[in-house]
Amino acid sequence: MVLNIETNLLSYARAGHEAPIIFHRDTQKIDREEIDGIAIGLVDKPTFTSIIETKNIQLRSGDLVVTYTDGITEAMNGKNEEWGLLELIESIKKHREDDVSDLLKNIESDVLCFVGNVPQYDDMTMLAIKIK
């Protein structure tokens, strides 16, 4: 993932991770486009290069980008239910006006409230960028 801070052009490729969630402030819509990709190291370089796809998105003031590992969306509660992508998107919408640090803390709080005391066995990692 590369963000040109002069033009606010975001470029990303998938190499085994989840597609970023982008909240567009002016339209209040979520953009999350799956693109072709494969985890790094699974195939040789020529095959990897032929599979990988790059996506460019023009961001504007107030737009929010959230990347995350599947440990967030696959977090399980005591009923063996996953928190899920829709819940993550709703949490982003709910906390979208927060500064980035609080946004991440509040999403984490939503996930932990859902799972309760159930041990999790996957990492839960997030990164958020808000365009000024």
List each language-model region with its residue ranges.
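Conserved subregion of the PPM/PP2C metallophosphatase catalytic domain
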Residues: 1-132
